[in-house]
Structure formats: structure tokens, C-alpha cells
Regions:
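Non-catalytic terminal/interface segments that mediate subunit docking, oligomerization
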Residues: 1-87, 91
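Extracytoplasmic/secreted cell-surface and envelope-processing proteins
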Residues: 93-95
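Peripheral docking tails and interdomain loops at the edges
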Residues: 97, 101-155
Length: 155
């Protein structure tokens, strides 16, 4: 059995991004659509920020968005590769599908993720709106980030 560090795969993710940025000047850009007051989105925004920064992706932090329209407009103007909707389970049924539809109507290539593990009912609603994925403690961090690197052309 060859010895190895358990962190090697994650180090490779980070190095791949750093090398790509050095070579192209471009990185995977993640826009956070933080909905509602700070206590409503902070925990999930912090979690997905750390999740994405494992691969050295650029996370675009921002102020809160009181309306879906403001969040959609800012996400589209950001030039991000992906938007992550951050809020609470109680507000997601109203907010998440609307943000997703608003983004996808103008830029169907932008990925839209939900911060958190949705209920079966919420997942059905969000999937129908075009939500691309869900990021929570149940997510496979390595596989998610690797897939995003592949989609960005880092391989």
C-alpha cells in the first residue's frame, strides 16, 4: 500500500484552480444571492462560501437582497458562473424558484444552486424551476467541486 495524505485530492482541486487562474486569468465565480435579513441567510452563506473556497473558487459576497428582482438583476450583472440562493427553509418555497426562473430566463447557462438540503416537496418545486443542484452538509464536496472544474474547462 502506497502512503498518501488524505488531503491530497483536495489539494489537487485547489492547485488545479490556482494553475488555471495563473494561466487564463479566469476563475469559477460564485455569486451569493443572500435573501432577507442577515440572520435569515448568514449560516448558509458562510457554509457555501467555505465549501466553494476549498477549490479556491472566487465567491462574490454582497449585501442582502430584499426582493427576488434585485437578487436576479445583481446575479446576472455579476458575470458569475453560478448563483447560490441563501435563505431559510421557511422562505425557500417563495424565493428559490423565483430567483432560479428569473436567472434562467435571461442566462440559461448560469448554474443556480440552493444552500441547504431541500425537503422532497421543495426539491420538486425547485427542480421544475430549473435549479441545478443543492449544497448542504450532505453534499459530496470533492465531487461537486471537481464537476464544476470540469464544466469550467480546467481539464
Amino acid at each position: 500500500i502506497a502512503p498518501h495524505r488524505w488531503t491530497e485530492r483536495y489539494e489537487e482541486l485547489r492547485m488545479r484552480t490556482e494553475n488555471f487562474v495563473a494561466k487564463t486569468g479566469a476563475n469559477v465565480k460564485i455569486f451569493l444571492a443572500n435573501m432577507g435579513p442577515i440572520p435569515q441567510h448568514k449560516a448558509r452563506a458562510d457554509f457555501v462560501t467555505s465549501f466553494m473556497q476549498v477549490a479556491a473558487f472566487e465567491v462574490m459576497t454582497n449585501n442582502v437582497f430584499p426582493t427576488v428582482e434585485e437578487a436576479v438583476k445583481a446575479a446576472l450583472e455579476s458575470g458569475a458562473d453560478a448563483t447560490i440562493v441563501c435563505s431559510t427553509d421557511a422562505t425557500y418555497p417563495e424565493l428559490a424558484p423565483a430567483v432560479t426562473k428569473g436567472i434562467k430566463a435571461v442566462n440559461p447557462e448560469m448554474k443556480v444552486f440552493l444552500a441547504g438540503a431541500p425537503s422532497a416537496e421543495l426539491k420538486e418545486i425547485c427542480d421544475a424551476a430549473g435549479m441545478d443542484d443543492y449544497i448542504s452538509v450532505k453534499s459530496n464536496c470533492y465531487e461537486t467541486l471537481l464537476r464544476m472544474q470540469k464544466e469550467r474547462g480546467m481539464f
